[in-house]
Amino acid sequence: MWFDSHCHLHICEQDVTLDDLFARARTNGVDQMVAIGIEVASSERALEIAREHPEVYSSAGVHPNDATSWSEQSEERIDKLLAHDEVVAVGETGLDFYRDYTPHDVQRAAFRDHIELAKRHRKPLVIHTRDSTSAAIEELEAVEPPSKLIFHCWSGTTGELRRALDLGAHISFAGNVSFKSAENLRDAARLVPADRLLIETDSPFLAPVPHRGKPNEPGFVAAVGRAIAEARSEDEADVALTTTANARQIFGLAR
């Protein structure tokens, strides 16, 4: 069975019914997933979905591209969401220097607050690092980091990977690891210790081969797993077992 460690169900449900989405996921052997929030409203919706569907857990946080919305009020609302058992992670937070929607200092300030929330609630920090991996690692190295870190949709260099692993982080790979041009990601996947490896869809974005060009969904995480298995010269079933066990461990789930 597979575990999708990062999907945006609040976006997916704009185009498909969640019941259909979950049925296709089950058909593809996906039995658990984490619905990721990117601002207060989507974090609240992710919790609603998790309460309605036992196979879903959720996260709460504000994406760096929305960091201008971060305030004492939004932090208080995220803090309250994190008190719920169904909310198993803080984020998606981090830094995004690619789109540059938000001043870097504003992103960094919001990221630092999320770091403290993760420490306070003892929940893993889900980190977005588009064109900003080194800067995000620097922020974590400058403080006592949370004990559980997840670098989502890994895209960093080999040196950055070593630094992230030195922090004790888990590394999550998305559908782009299956792209023909992504040999650098497959190289990274080979270097990650088995007990730190996660997979995700980042639905509805980054659909893996052979679904590339379609809206992504949790059921496609098996294709991500197959790409990882091929890159690591491992059995697909072993990758499914390992990544599912890792996800359940870092999110604090019994099963």
Regions flagged by a language model, labelled:
Residues 1-255:
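Mid-domain alpha/beta scaffold segments of enzyme catalytic cores
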